[in-house]
Amino acid sequence: VIKLARKKTLVQELFCIENLSRVDMLCLDKTGTITQGKMTVSDILPLTAQPPFDLEEAVGSFIGALDDNNATFLALGERFPARGRWRAVCRTPFSSARKWSSVTFEGRGTVLVGAPEILLRGRSGLLPPAVAEREAAGCRVVLVAHSEERVEGVLPGTVRPVAALVLEDPIRPDARETLAFFTREDVQLKII
């Protein structure tokens, strides 16, 4: 306890420290844990030569139609300010179980935003290699897609990829040192 106090650590219950000394695996969520939690859209990869809509206007209207505050949505909102010009007639909010969200707009079809492998039903191999390269480099890639169908919580039969949005979140300056400490202490690290 005295050693920890010297390192400006408050010990409220000693048994917690004893339990922590037996930890041999630490599971971490990358976003906001080893990153700074300052996600931004760093690149836009067009996926079609003839998009069905102006990307800025579509994603801006999408942001304006949904009320969400997760890190990805906030980063998209910074890059594509909410415009709300298009009239939304149906919304499917994001859920971590579904991994996508959508807004159906009057006279414009549905804009879908989510995980490429989910929106494309496992056919993400159809995407250009640059998408997989960005994912392999640790970036989050979000697919913007379009469907002529009205969407109410179930993926439509036809989803047309429009663009891949590459999001980056800077690594915390002390992350390397922290992770190295746990490795030296024989604690397995798992990024979930």
Regions found by a protein language model. Name each.
Residues 1-15, 38-41:
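Juxtamembrane helix-loop transition segments at the membrane interface in multi-pass membrane proteins
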Residues 16-161, 167, 180-191:
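Cytosolic catalytic regions of ATP/NTP-dependent phosphoryl-transfer enzymes
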Residues 171-180:
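The conserved cystathionine-beta-synthase
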